[in-house]
Amino acid sequence: MTCPHPRRWLVVLMLVTAGAVCRPAEAQRLTIAGDRFAVDGGPRFLTFISYFGVMEIDDVDEDLAFLKNAGFDGVRIWPNWRDGPPLMRSDGTLIATAIERLHRVLDSARAHRLVVDVTFTAEEIPGLDAPQYLRAVTAAVEELKPYDNLLVDIHNERDVHGPFGRRLAADDVTSIAAAVKAADPNRIVTASNSPNTSPESAAQFTVDAGLDVTAYHEDRGANWYKAEQIERVVTALKRNGRPAYLQEPTRFPFPSTDRSDYFRIARMNAKRAGAAAWCFHTELGFDVRDTTFKRRLAARVQPEWSFVSELVARIHLRTSDGMHYLVAEGGGGGAVLADRRFPGPWETLTFTSIDGGPVFAGDRVSLGASDGHFFRAEAGGGGALTATAEAVGAWETFVVETNHAGPIADGDQIALRTDTDPPWYITADQSGGASVAVVGHAAGPWETFEVIVAAAASELRLPIPDLTGIGRFDADCRRAGRLGIAGDDQK
């Protein structure tokens, strides 16, 4: 039995950002695979964050690096945002300095391996009519050609907004979509609709207008986050066989938004319902002229900072003897053992779905050590388990098995196997207290581990909100855990 050394508790929790995300899975080329998005050819549930004011500041590198390390797949930006320098003129031409600024944003996003939703708008440009808007969007798409990591929203909530403050007509959307495809045939194109359009009508509009994705803004009622509500919307959106993108859910201070748990549950339910992507919508990215997005997020603990800082799941894995934890010796870079009696930084692992979003049973996952290394099945299985990998590839990919089909929750008993045929299972010798290897042929007691959600909120010096006294939702959130590896239903 080995007790944790006191010095280990002095280790700064590098888990909070650095190296916490599976790097190769979140790369540069965004495509469509059936009714899902794909990144570098691999289908992936995408998590975006609204950053409308990104054009307001000269250097976005710090913010985009932070968002990537926090676990986001992409950002949603508005080049014609009301507080920033506009991209377009009323005659349909583009402003050169704004083009340069947009390129800097997109170059930084590409460098940090972030996907970008470029959402255009016309109502912010006085005198811009629909024909000139077509000209402007087409010119902008020409400027976007070097970037494979983005999609284009022709107009935000086109059923409400458009040139001269009126909606952008369906025929205009169809014409602009055709012009975009003529300029860049591989560009992913959508045109978002508000809740004024039903999900069923939005799905049909996508087909009629020749769009690739159904981007939808949900109703901002009190039940917006619940499984039944999200499943109803996503099911209707997916009837056209194309990706359903929940592009703009509700935000604070609308009903049921004052705690991050609502957003964690909504994201989980979006993935479970089969959505292709979900966006964390916040007005804190609307105006960043005098600060950074990160500082604005940190200034509001609930819901923004709590959600953002806990997006990457952090867990301990307890062996089936109930007394030992998996440990990346030295915090990573060497051996993995199962001989520690108390969980600390070295026993705290990032638990990231390579398939995107919260971890569900059957997902392919990576396990990250506190120094940024990843767990590796040496030779792909049949031998040692180490924490020596600097990136995630085949040897660093494991599949989660448990006794249900839903999201992985605090207290779940899981097994982890290689994504090979035949598979190899991570095995704690003698069910704990000794070595760990990837040598199991089936999931038995030695291959079974209990998921314990790490107390990330306290580690980040964040106050944990008092969720008592709010009935069923209170119980659901406690079952969901603090990090979004959530409970069964949350209806």
Please identify what each model-predicted range represents.
Residues 1-11:
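Bacterial N-terminal signal peptides that target proteins for export
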Residues 11-20:
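Bacterial N-terminal signal peptides
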Residues 22-27:
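Boundary at the C-terminal end of the N-terminal hydrophobic targeting segment
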Residues 28-112:
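Active-site-adjacent substrate/metal-binding segments within catalytic domains
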Residues 66-72, 93-119, 125-152:
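An active-site-proximal structural segment forming one wall of the substrate-binding cleft
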Residues 135, 149-151, 155-305:
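Extracellular glycoside hydrolase catalytic/binding regions
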Residues 310-462, 475-478, 491:
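Lectin-like carbohydrate-binding module/patch detector with strong preference for beta-trefoil
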